[in-house]
């Protein structure tokens, strides 16, 4: 039981009521105020804002032999927990630590600070309110009572950085109560990273818009090249940014437009002060990602490559051919596993793609993983196609959305092909066209 004193809680509410009355606001029902005084308050009932299906989470916890899933956040340090608990809404301040425990059986429980005691009111369960650090420690001890193993956003040896969100000190605090902490990676994949029907529909619309913008950009690059109009990477990028606005897309960044040696840097970004001209007979890589401007929308993310001349040099064509084969191998592996209802993990997809590139003699030119999760952020928290930068052992589950984007990088150019894959119950779908070859723009007949 928390030792947060009832009379102190009541004084807080009385002060808040007085301020509200002085400002002309209404005074809440005093009985409702008293109901929030110590542990044991209702959290207000599930109103549908929380993406978690608590009974389904509890089934998963029991299947994995875990006693609970302990969500924790401080000041936005754990965006996974914040999103699951829906504390990211406008007008909400999250400057204090909160915990929310979903036990394998029984009622969820929360531990919240007195000045932000309503932040978890949308969630099912009961809460304890604390103010000082002694009350926090007592409340946490009560919250963890009887538990042996809980899942948190933690990854052993930081193997999956996207999951490793809880700081080492908080892990010590939990483990100091005799509780073993396990990774919540598989739980996050299932309950935070999988798309519902609305998310999939938003992704499709975003993808369709990105492909149209890509076509317009290729047309602009080709036309300017043929007409000998001086054009910088930044010029094309800003045209594309305007088309994003026209299409109702938002993004965390303007698109990548990278010519020749700049395409050898996978995360090159042209800016007004640093941008090269796009010359004749040069390769140009476009990487563009965006989502609809609506709550819950998920990203689409594609990469295509063109050439401003008539004939693509053999060196570039061979490299792209290997990238295309690696991409297609990864996609086919996912499709086959889905059809056969066979378990597949992120690292296996990456390894399959990289083996194609290595067998083609390009192993030394691989700089990154094969793909990443897609979500409301372009790099989502779900399973990544990665056995290169990390070892992502999480399973690909129905509802997963992710990229497949093998690339090769040399001193004078780089090539990459990026597509998006959605995993349905019975089929894996690539949500857009696949590039077959580097597109030569020197002809008036541009093939996309």
Q: PLM ranges: what are they?
A:
Residues 4-18, 22-448:
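Active-site neighborhoods and metal-handling regions in enzymes and metal-associated proteins
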């Amino acid at each position: 039981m928390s030792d947060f004193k009832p009379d102190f809680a009541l004084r807080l509410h009385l002060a808040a009521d007085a301020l509200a009355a002085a400002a002309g606001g209404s005074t809440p029902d005093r009985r409702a105020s008293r109901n929030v005084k110590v542990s044991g308050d209702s959290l207000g009932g599930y109103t549908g804002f929380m993406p978690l299906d608590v009974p389904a989470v509890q089934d998963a916890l029991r299947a994995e032999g875990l006693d609970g899933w302990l969500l924790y956040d401080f000041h936005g340090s754990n965006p996974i927990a914040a999103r699951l608990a829906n504390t990211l809404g406008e007008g909400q301040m999250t400057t204090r630590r909160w915990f929310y425990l979903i036990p394998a059986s029984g009622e969820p429980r929360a531990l919240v600070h007195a000045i932000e005691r309503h932040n978890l009111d949308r969630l099912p369960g009961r809460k304890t309110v604390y103010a000082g650090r002694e009350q926090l420690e007592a409340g946490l001890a009560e919250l963890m009572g009887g538990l042996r193993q809980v899942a948190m956003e933690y990854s052993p040896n930081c193997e999956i950085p996207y999951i490793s969100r809880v700081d080492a000190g908080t892990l010590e605090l939990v483990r100091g109560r005799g509780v073993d902490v396990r990774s919540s990676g598989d739980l996050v994949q299932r309950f935070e990273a999988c798309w519902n029907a609305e998310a999939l529909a938003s992704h499709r619309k975003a993808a369709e818009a990105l492909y149209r913008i890509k076509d317009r950009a290729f047309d602009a690059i080709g036309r300017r090249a043929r007409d000998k109009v001086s054009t910088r990477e930044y010029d094309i990028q800003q045209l594309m940014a305007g088309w994003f606005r026209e299409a109702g897309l938002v993004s965390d960044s303007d698109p990548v437009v990278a010519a020749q040696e700049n395409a050898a840097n996978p995360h090159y970004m042209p800016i007004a002060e640093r941008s090269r001209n796009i010359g004749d007979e040069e390769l140009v890589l476009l990487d563009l990602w965006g989502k609809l401007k609506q709550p819950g929308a998920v990203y689409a993310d594609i990469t295509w490559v063109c050439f401003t001349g008539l004939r693509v040099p053999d060196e570039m064509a061979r490299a792209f051919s290997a990238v295309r084969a690696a991409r297609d191998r990864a996609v086919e592996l996912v499709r086959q596993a889905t059809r056969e209802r066979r378990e597949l993990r992120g690292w296996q997809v990456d390894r399959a793609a990289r083996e194609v590139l290595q067998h083609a003699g390009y192993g030394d030119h691989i700089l990154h993983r094969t793909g990443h999760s897609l979500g409301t952020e372009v790099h989502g928290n779900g399973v990544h196609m990665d056995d290169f930068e990390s070892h992502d052992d999480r399973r690909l589950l129905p509802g997963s959305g992710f990229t497949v984007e093998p690339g090769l990088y040399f001193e004078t150019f780089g090539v990459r092909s990026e597509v998006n894959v959605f995993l349905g119950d019975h089929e894996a779908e690539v949500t857009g066209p696949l590039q077959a070859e580097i597109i030569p723009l020197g002809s008036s007949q541009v093939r996309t």
